[in-house]
């Protein structure tokens, strides 16, 4: 077991409960999809896993004994946690290679980051681009790439961190179906080959059923399903989506999050 969440709860200012007593385990090489309606708590869960939000109650333990509320453990955890965003968060005027190299900055001091990175880091970045099928685009500016290619650069950047955990927050929401399948296929293959625990939030049930080893359904901050993709049926989907309220936790301004300290 790599990560354990025990009775995790998050309450935002005003008393809005984004997560309620969530207990989950995640294992190396496991490809998990979090399904839920907008405002169900999916993104809050991912932010907790990355240490960006401090839970109101409960614990997050990695490697069986280290809790990420310890600042030193949290720093090490973030260093080895790759994050893939819905809006890829790339630097448009830079090349694909330059963007992927930013994934290596966590391994260098702030002062060192102002200077060219070592050749070893460039080799790692090029290998990551090759693994997502974009080695030939290494020197292309990312604003000249398609949306699907840009998201694959985002995967390569996260992979350059040499992560043990990969988090993806609605990574294909803005892509067409063909690009969505390609992006998730690359991500799943890489994580399984490298033994990386992958946790991805999605809206698309068809993609979850096609690629997930495990699906976790969340509704109003509570876990309502946890099982294999083959086990999820219409009744489970009704439990996940049928009772969602029109509350969008992801729209709460970031300055109102219960943010964790560095």
From Swiss-Prot:
What Pfam families does the database record attribute to this sequence? ABC_tran (PF00005)
Q: Name one GO molecular function term.
A: ATP binding
Q: Entry's InterPro entries?
A: AAA+_ATPase (IPR003593), ABC_transporter-like_ATP-bd (IPR003439), ABC_transporter-like_CS (IPR017871), ABC_transpr_PhnC (IPR012693), MetN_ABC_transporter-like (IPR050086), P-loop_NTPase (IPR027417)
| Compartments, as annotated in UniProt | Cell inner membrane
Q: Where are the transmembrane segments?
A: none
Q: What is its main location?
A: membrane
Q: Which domain of life is it from?
A: Bacteria
Positions contributing to ATP binding? 36-43
Q: Name the Enzyme Commission number(s) assigned to this protein.
A: 7.3.2.2
What PROSITE patterns does its record include? ABC_TRANSPORTER_1, ABC_TRANSPORTER_2, PHNC
* Annotated keywords: ATP-binding, Cell inner membrane, Cell membrane, Membrane, Nucleotide-binding, Phosphonate transport, Plasmid, Translocase, Transport
Residue span, ABC transporter domain: 3-245
Stated membrane topology is:
Peripheral membrane protein
- Cellular component aspect of the GO annotation: plasma membrane
Task: Show the catalytic activity.
Answer: phosphonate(out) + ATP + H2O = phosphonate(in) + ADP + phosphate + H(+)
| Job of this protein | Part of the ABC transporter complex PhnCDE involved in phosphonates import. Responsible for energy coupling to the transport system.
What's this protein's family per the entry?
Belongs to the ABC transporter superfamily. Phosphonates importer (TC 3.A.1.9.1) family.
Q: How does it assemble?
A: The complex is composed of two ATP-binding proteins (PhnC), two transmembrane proteins (PhnE) and a solute-binding protein (PhnD).
Q: What is this protein called?
A: Phosphonates import ATP-binding protein PhnC 3
The protein's organism comes out as Nostoc sp. (strain PCC 7120 / SAG 25.82 / UTEX 2576)
Name of the coding gene: phnC3
């Amino acid at each position: 077991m790599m990560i354990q969440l025990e009775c995790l709860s998050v309450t935002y200012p005003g008393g809005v409960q984004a997560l309620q007593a969530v207990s989950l385990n995640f294992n190396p090489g496991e490809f998990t999809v979090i399904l839920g309606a907008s405002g169900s708590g999916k993104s809050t869960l991912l932010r907790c896993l990355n240490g960006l939000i401090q839970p109101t109650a409960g614990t997050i333990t990695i490697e069986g004994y280290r809790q990420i509320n310890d600042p030193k453990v949290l720093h090490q955890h973030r260093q080895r946690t790759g994050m893939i965003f819905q809006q890829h968060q790339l630097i448009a005027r830079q090349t694909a290679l330059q963007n992927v190299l930013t994934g290596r900055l966590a391994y260098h001091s702030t002062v060192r980051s102002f200077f060219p990175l070592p050749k070893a880091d460039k080799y790692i970045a090029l290998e990551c681009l090759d693994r997502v099928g974009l080695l030939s685009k290494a020197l292309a500016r990312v604003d000249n790439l398609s949306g699907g290619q840009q998201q694959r650069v985002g995967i390569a950047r996260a992979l350059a961190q040499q992560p043990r955990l990969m988090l993806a927050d609605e990574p294909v929401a803005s892509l067409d179906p063909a690009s969505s399948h390609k992006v998730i296929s690359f991500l799943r293959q890489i994580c399984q080959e490298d033994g990386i625990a992958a946790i991805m939030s999605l809206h698309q049930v068809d993609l979850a059923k096609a690629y997930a080893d495990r699906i976790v359904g969340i509704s109003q901050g509570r876990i309502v399903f946890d099982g294999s993709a083959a086990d999820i049926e219409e009744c489970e989907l009704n439990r996940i989506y049928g009772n969602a309220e029109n509350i969008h936790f992801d729209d709460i301004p970031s300055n109102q999050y219960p943010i964790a300290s560095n």
